[in-house]
Amino acid sequence: MHHIQHPHPTHSGVDMTEGNITGHLIRFALPLLAGNIFQQLYNMVDTWVVGNFVSNEAFSAVGTVGPIVNMLIGCFLGFSSGVGVVISQYYGARRTERVHDAVHTALVLTVILCAVFTALGVGFTPLMLRLMNTPAEVFPESSAYLTIYFGGISGLLIYNMGSGILRAVGDSRRPFYFLVVSAVLNTALDLLFVLRFGMGVEGVAWATVIAQAVSALLVIVVLLRTQQAVRLIPRDLRIHLPVLRQIIRVGVPSALQMAITAFSNVFVQSYINSFGADCMGGWTAYTKIDQLMLLPMQSLALSATTFVGQNLGRGNEPRARQGVRRALAIAMAATVLVMIPVLAFAPQMTAFFNRKPEVVAYGALLLRCISPFYVLCCFNQVYAAALRGAGNSKATMIIMLCSFVLFRQVYLFIMSHYISHELIPLVMGYPAGWLVCSAATLIYYRRTSFLSTRLVAEDGSKEDIQ
């Protein structure tokens, strides 16, 4: 087993417990941001290929399955963030043997979850589509797409867990390289399967599955070859119960929060579906651009999680909090920079996905009404990520469920039944939810101590922080 000889950056991991805070946050966030942009771009290529070369029904089908896919991926990402928090705290505390145990426990769990997700996804596809009021003309293609996607979802899960492990020790660069390879391959296969072989929506699904499998393979090869504490040694693959308990403590609330928040979007989608196919098309385009606008703050939030995790591992709460303040300031500045061109060029951005005038009108309207409120999102994203890094994901789960699920559903119900069944009053449920969530998260963050939820100290082992 390889021990970390010194606390300074190795050839790939980065120790965030010393050195320039802003520099660490930005250096860590940039590959994340670039990687996420690539991921969104290749999702957009999928949508663009379908919208321009297959059919309008197929375009709506890919949009319709979005919330279902996001719900399951969100669930797994929440769980893998739990793994990342455990590893980053032990890495910060220089507890190499615990890092090793966490890596191998996480990978065994991932294999088990791959089997569960594949079975559930393939088995429940028709039921999920029916629950979402999927129109009959879109149903066969939506069903075909989801069945292939879930059949090959293991690649996505393994890649996400492997890259989460690397990020926990400060290496956000290599996961980015693998994403680029995956995105380029996905685009090439899209064009080959759809344009050359005429495979339609199924071709798009196969392209995604193959590209994700390649990124999973690359991340496993790196874990097998790395000289760091996160090295994968196949004979050591087993579940270590003390570490498993900690992963569950952080990961399960995060997974529930992400899955249920995404599930609440399924309800929003069914309200949108009631406005007809043009509005569905506009909403599909809006959600694609929305995901790009959220990326700067999400990348900085992930930086904050790793930064807080490593610094609390060392027992340095003031430095951890200083990092959170910097991350929030950078996230807000970046969000404003992204917002300006979106407000200016909303119709052109919508038309990139679908040139039908009615669809463009809906998409541009949605973008211009909702995007000025994204700055509110920075607060809940960064503070919740910081609390998660401290091992406290239960509180953020409760706050987000109350804001994004309870509050938003009550808002949608009252608005649609008693006030106005028009599009804009309904979709203002998004900014209203962000406002409630940000206020509650900020109040909680100010009143809570990071060290009380730290994982390293509770671990019961004598060999604690130096």
PLM feature segments, named:
Residues 16-53, 67-82, 86, 111-118, ...:
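N-terminal transmembrane alpha-helices
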Residues 27-46, 148, 159, 182, ...:
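Transmembrane helical elements of multi-pass membrane transporters/channels
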Residues 59-119, 156-175, 269, 282-346, ...:
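Small-residue-rich hydrophobic transmembrane alpha-helices
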Residues 71-74, 118, 186-191, 216-220, ...:
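Hydrophobic transmembrane alpha-helices of multi-pass small-molecule transporters
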Residues 37, 41-60, 129-136, 192-199, ...:
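Helix-terminus/linker motif at the lipid-water interface of multi-pass membrane proteins
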Residues 1-29, 87-154, 196-252, 308-373, ...:
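Short alpha-helical transmembrane segments in multi-pass integral membrane proteins
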Residues 80, 148-167, 175-183, 204-219, ...:
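Short runs within selected transmembrane alpha-helices of multi-pass transporters and secretion channels
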